[in-house]
Every structure is written in structure tokens, then in C-alpha cells.
Amino acid sequence: MSGGELSGTDNARLKDAVQRAEGLSGLKFSLYLGDSGDDPHATALELHGRLVDPANTVLVLCDPQQHALEIVTGAEARRSLTDEECQLAALSMQSNFVAGDLIGGLSHGLAQLGGYARKSRILHVTEG
């Protein structure tokens, strides 16, 4: 996570949001906040590819200067998190960004992604 301009409180909120999303879903989450160069999508793909376990990781890239937001899911993560769910989380984050709440938007978006990817509990009904 790149957060040179973030306060300690903001950094802590984002780290907590990442940990909660991971706890809910069993996936790994990575957040990049900063400059994404000329092509945010290509940058997100490159960053995702450099992660320790890209197959099981969801990368959220946010470049406030370029108004760019990218969500990249690894091959295994994609089994638990659909493109539509990522789009819904992105729309939610963007709504917060427009209202001037970058940290809240990222935190809530990560929570949404973690919730969408939550592993379902299998309930067995005993006939009797």
C-alpha cells in the first residue's frame, strides 16, 4: 500500500479494512494508493502479477490524481468474486470519492468485496 500522504489513522483504517476483507473471504487483498502512470489498468495488472500469491489475491488500485480505480482478481479469487460484484463495490467506492471521502470509500469497498467473496457455510439438514 502506498500511502505517503496518509495520516497514521487513515493508514490504520485501510490496513484494518484489508485484514477484515481477508478474514471474511479467505482471500488475500492488496491495496495500492498512489500514482498509476499513463495506463492505470496496465499498472494494476503489473502490480497484481508481482504479488506473492496473485491467484488468490484481489488488488484494488486507486489513483486519486487520475480518478482511476481498478480491481484485479486472481484466477482462484475470481471463483469467489464475480466481475459484477467488483463493479458494485467500485460504484460504491466512487460514490464516496465524489463526496470527498477517499478513506471511507476504500474501507467500505474492501468490506463489500470481502463480504461478496465470503465463503458460504454449508448447512446439512438431517431428515428424521
For each feature predicted by the language model, list its residue ranges.
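A structural boundary signal for the start of the first folded domain, especially the loop/turn
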Residues: 1-57, 64-128
